[in-house]
């Protein structure tokens, strides 16, 4: 391969249709929904058989520490996280990545493999072989989209109509693109299934940095102009690449399909059957999951009796069901969702209601993730003025309290060893040892071994 192949992972979605597990501050791409690792990690790991460079991940600034931690677990953290201060859709996001890669590879023309972070692929070998087959077309200057062989009439996806076949084998086919089709109605989708020339538009792409910038400059020079100005003012912060919000917010919002793929004369489509799913709803996870003899997909401490064809998940605590069928039941530490499987697309209406009601359950989980670890709000009472949190600090990290003058603290080490600095005094705390921290005193916590969990009781409310 003459050109470096660089995965560009789009990780900016909120996944509201998978509430209550997916939330604004911890959306579905960071969850372990279909594997023992997160969807973001799966997206990167399934490329292991390809000779790729370190991935570039584009994400919301709010999710930066989650992305960094998940990349660190894969040993893929390499100053490669681009932080979007505001979402401007896929065309500008990919443009920013292309301009940064052009800067980093001044004497090369890397290939960008653009992938959403939250898709599921069952046939990984076929997927990778199809990418390999598409590389020569991208190196020749084509813009490659990846089409999925449809398994049913689907009104939630766009379609690609293929034209003249350029290359094929038993597992893949590369063709000219005849047209892109917007999300159809059911009757039209049913007609597509009867033909062998329509494929789901997967939202995955392969092209060189230069060709994407050339085509975007041709059709949307306004986007390129703002992105160029943004990249001139990027700021490197640890493993993050920060964009100037004042500049980037002026960028028009546009998808790559509208901006480039539907207009370019050099689009080709690599079609494949890879067991693909965009995991857009709980019903998708029921379809993907391993079912018991009654057709149920269950995760967690669950007892089922006379229960059929249901998806049941519990994050904490026992869930028991009797005499139900075709339901989705999702139980988290602070919320419970019960829905018919054929109605779960409407969970977004619940999220909108929570937002309009000023609630927080659609935004954050009870347990939140920080740069230094995580914090679980176990219990609280405004009436009795206390709050109990379980704080877990990562190895070699420091936790510094955002102290408030009226707050008193009692800290208990549940597991591990910690060095606690209270004002100027240093204390070493081991398991089951506690310390009292008076109101208004600065304090910080440093971990001395691999795992430490600290339980803190507060008499006022304060953020971690």
From Swiss-Prot:
InterPro entries: GMPP_N (IPR049577), Man1P_GuaTrfase/Man6P_Isoase (IPR006375), Man6P_isomerase-2_C (IPR001538), ManC/GMP-like_b-helix (IPR054566), Mannose-6P_isomerase_type2 (IPR051161), NTP_transferase_dom (IPR005835), Nucleotide-diphossugar_trans (IPR029044), RmlC-like_jellyroll (IPR014710). It comes from the Bacteria. The keyword DNA repair does not apply. GO terms for biological process: GDP-mannose biosynthetic process; O antigen biosynthetic process. Transmembrane segments: none annotated. The lineage of its organism: Bacteria, Pseudomonadati, Pseudomonadota, Gammaproteobacteria, Enterobacterales. Its EC number is 2.7.7.13. Belongs to the mannose-6-phosphate isomerase type 2 family. Pathway: Nucleotide-sugar biosynthesis; GDP-alpha-D-mannose biosynthesis; GDP-alpha-D-mannose from alpha-D-mannose 1-phosphate (GTP route): step 1/1; Bacterial outer membrane biogenesis; LPS O-antigen biosynthesis. This is Mannose-1-phosphate guanylyltransferase. Involved in GDP-mannose biosynthesis which serves as the activated sugar nucleotide precursor for mannose residues in cell surface polysaccharides. This enzyme participates in synthesis of the LPS O7 antigen. It catalyses: alpha-D-mannose 1-phosphate + GTP + H(+) = GDP-alpha-D-mannose + diphosphate. Keywords: GTP-binding, Lipopolysaccharide biosynthesis, Nucleotide-binding, Nucleotidyltransferase, Transferase. It holds the Pfam family MannoseP_isomer. The keyword Zinc does not apply. It comes from Escherichia coli. One of its GO terms (molecular function) is GTP binding.
């Amino acid at each position: 391969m003459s050109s470096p192949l660089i995965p560009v992972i789009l990780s900016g979605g909120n996944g509201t249709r998978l509430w209550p597990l997916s939330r604004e501050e911890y959306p579905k791409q960071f969850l372990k929904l279909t594997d023992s690792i997160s969807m973001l990690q799966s997206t990167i790991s399934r490329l292991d058989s390809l000779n790729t460079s370190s991935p570039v991940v584009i994400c919301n600034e709010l999710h930066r520490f989650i992305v960094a931690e998940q990349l660190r677990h894969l040993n893929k953290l390499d100053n490669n996280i681009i932080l979007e201060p505001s979402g401007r859709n896929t065309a500008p996001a990919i443009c920013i990545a292309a301009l940064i890669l052009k800067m980093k590879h001044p004497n090369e023309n890397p290939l960008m493999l653009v992938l959403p972070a939250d898709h599921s692929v069952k046939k990984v070998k076929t997927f990778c072989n199809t990418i390999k087959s598409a590389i020569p077309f991208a190196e020749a200057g084509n813009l490659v989209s990846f089409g999925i062989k449809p398994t049913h009439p689907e009104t939630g996806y766009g379609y690609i109509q293929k034209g003249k076949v350029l290359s094929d084998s038993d597992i893949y086919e590369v063709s000219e693109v005849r047209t892109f089709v917007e999300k159809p109605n059911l009757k039209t989708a049913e007609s597509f299934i009867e033909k062998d020339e329509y494929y789901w538009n997967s939202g995955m792409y392969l092209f060189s940095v230069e060709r994407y910038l050339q085509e975007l400059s041709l059709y949307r020079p306004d986007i390129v102009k703002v992105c160029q100005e943004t990249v001139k003012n990027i700021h490197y912060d640890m493993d993050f690449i920060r964009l100037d919000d004042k500049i980037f917010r002026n960028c028009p919002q546009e998808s790559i399909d509208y901006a480039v793929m539907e207009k370019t004369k050099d689009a080709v489509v690599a079609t494949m059957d890879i067991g693909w799913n965009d995991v857009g709803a709980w019903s998708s996870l029921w379809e993907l999951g391993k079912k018991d003899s009654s057709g149920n997909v269950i995760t967690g401490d669950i007892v089922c009796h006379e229960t059929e064809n249901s998806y049941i998940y519990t994050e904490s605590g026992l869930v028991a069901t009797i005499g139900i069928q075709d339901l989705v039941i999702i139980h988290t530490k602070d919320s419970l969702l019960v829905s018919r499987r054929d109605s779960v697309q409407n969970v977004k209406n619940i999220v909108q209601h929570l937002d309009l009601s000023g609630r927080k359950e659609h935004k954050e989980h009870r347990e939140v993730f920080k740069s230094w670890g995580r914090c679980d709000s176990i219990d609280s009472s405004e009436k009795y003025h206390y709050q109990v949190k379980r704080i877990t600090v990562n190895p070699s990290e420091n936790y510094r309290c955002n102290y408030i003058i009226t707050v008193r603290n009692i800290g208990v080490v549940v597991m591990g060893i910690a060095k606690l600095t209270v004002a100027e005094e240093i204390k070493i705390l081991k398991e089951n040892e506690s310390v009292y921290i008076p109101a208004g005193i600065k304090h910080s916590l440093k971990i001395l071994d691999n795992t430490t969990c600290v339980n803190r009781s507060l008499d006022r409310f304060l953020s971690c």
